[in-house]
Amino acid sequence: MGARKKISAEKRKEALKTMYFAKLQNVPTSPRKMRLVADMIRGMEVNRALGVLKFSSKEAAARVEKLLRSAIANWEQKNERKAESGELFVTQIFVDGGATLKRMRPAPQGRGYRIRKRSNHVTLFVGAKSNNEDQN
């Protein structure tokens, strides 16, 4: 690794130490379905977001709820105190496409239709309100 690349990688690692996030990788649902759930809670206060996810009928909401609880626990672990209501917000959440499994399904007249079984990666950042305003 070159010197410039190493320095920028070290800066990136230091920046991540001050951020509070959780990642969920290789979720076996399509990114499009997961983005619908992510858009529901973007920018919300965490207790309200947990309520929205708990009562959502979407299958992906249960996975994002668990991820949000993990991000809150990470924040509490790094700050060595419990989060108070109204203190934490979902500052960022994004969904990236993961690996796609390609399968074939038999089709009429000897053909085969391709099936793409998609997966995704979700990254969720939490922070205080002051951090939320600084990033925007």
From Swiss-Prot:
Originating species: Bacteroides thetaiotaomicron (strain ATCC 29148 / DSM 2079 / JCM 5827 / CCUG 10774 / NCTC 10582 / VPI-5482 / E50)
Family: Belongs to the universal ribosomal protein uL22 family.
Pfam families (alphabetical): Ribosomal_L22 (PF00237)
GO biological process terms held by the UniProt record: translation
GO MF, any single term: rRNA binding
Entry GO terms, CC: cytosolic large ribosomal subunit
CDD domains the UniProt entry points to: Ribosomal_L22 (cd00336)
Function: This protein binds specifically to 23S rRNA; its binding is stimulated by other ribosomal proteins, e.g. L4, L17, and L20. It is important during the early stages of 50S assembly. It makes multiple contacts with different domains of the 23S rRNA in the assembled 50S subunit and ribosome. The globular domain of the protein is located near the polypeptide exit tunnel on the outside of the subunit, while an extended beta-hairpin is found that lines the wall of the exit tunnel in the center of the 70S ribosome.
Subunit structure: Part of the 50S ribosomal subunit.
Gene from which this protein is expressed: rplV
Alphabetic keyword roster: Ribonucleoprotein, Ribosomal protein, RNA-binding, rRNA-binding
Protein name as catalogued: Large ribosomal subunit protein uL22
InterPro entries according to UniProt: Ribosomal_uL22, Ribosomal_uL22_bac/chlpt-type, Ribosomal_uL22_bac/org-type, Ribosomal_uL22_sf
Keyword rRNA-binding among UniProt keywords: yes
